[in-house]
Structures are given as C-alpha cells and as structure tokens.
Amino acid sequence: MEIVDLKKWIRDIPDFPEKGVIFRDITPLLKNPEVFKYSVEKIAELIKEWDFDCIVSPESRGFIFATPLAYLMNKEFVPIRKPGKLPYKTYSISYELEYGQTSLEMHVDAIDKGEKVIVVDDVLATGGTTKAIKELVDRAGGKTVGVVCLAELTYLNPRENLKDLEIASLIRY
C-alpha cells in the first residue's frame, strides 16, 4: 500500500467530551480495513528495534491497536481495565485525565518480575494514562521501557511527563 496520510482518517470533534477539548475520533480509520492494517503495520515498524517482552494497553481504544500489534510481533498482551472488569486480584491506580479523573486495574500476576513492557494506546495526550500504567507495571516488578501510539497531542506536552521512556507516534498534532 502506498503512503497514507493518516490524519485524513481521524475526525476532530470539538468540545467533546467537554468544552475546550478536541476529541480525535479514530472510527473513520477503523472503518477502512486497508488503512487500519496500514496503521498497525506502521506502528510495528516504529518499534521493531525496541527490546521488550510484553504489550500492555488501556481499555478500550488502546486494545484496538495493541492486540493486532501483539499478534503481529508475537508478544504477550496484558489488558489494563477499568475498575471491576477483571475477575482476579488486581493492582489499582487512580489518576488525572485531560478532562477528569479515572482509575485503572491490572491483574497482580499479569507481568513477570523483570519483564520489559511497552504501552500501546490510540492517543497520547498528557501522558497521564501511560504514567499510571507504568506505576502498575512497577508494582508487579516489571519495567516499562516505552510507549507507542497512533496519535500524539504534542500541544499537551506528554513527553514532559514521560522523560524516562522511549516514545513513538505515527501522527503528531
């Protein structure tokens, strides 16, 4: 497939979920199988030299890219879920979002001690979600080495919060 301008496949929704926020809607990209496949393959290219064992990802839109990426790269996948969604014992963390507060959980046995982990998400905004996931991985004895995403919102300065991680993104706003 020829080079695709992925920004053309992401719709901007102003004032969603609240006034002053521009929501980057990836559903048009997902509707086109060739463009979706292209985006997953390009993400894999971005991180092919990274040394990691496992992909972790927050629900729900992160799963969309993380699971095919884990399959393509033959890596473990660990889902990071909202509270009450995982059936076994969990680590839990609460943190601030660009537009509110939320919590995430991960099974206590999801990450092996010393395992190298990357975070995969659809959009990297403030870096708050990745930072929270890194804390969950640390509690389990793993080491978060990087984050990769479809789109990075550079105007929110996520790299300032994630200085100790490799960061890669296909699209920058």
UniProtKB/Swiss-Prot annotation:
Pfam families: Pribosyltran. It is found in: Cytoplasm. SUPFAM superfamilies: PRTase-like. The keyword Manganese does not apply. InterPro entries: Ade_phspho_trans, PRibTrfase_dom, PRTase-like, UPRTase/APRTase. The keyword Cytoplasm applies. One of its GO terms (biological process) is adenine salvage. Pathway: Purine metabolism; AMP biosynthesis via salvage pathway; AMP from adenine: step 1/1. It comes from the Bacteria. Keywords: Cytoplasm, Glycosyltransferase, Purine salvage, Transferase. GO terms for cellular component: cytoplasm. GO terms for molecular function: adenine binding; adenine phosphoribosyltransferase activity; AMP binding. Belongs to the purine/pyrimidine phosphoribosyltransferase family. Catalyzes a salvage reaction resulting in the formation of AMP, that is energically less costly than de novo synthesis. Homodimer. This is Adenine phosphoribosyltransferase. The gene is apt.
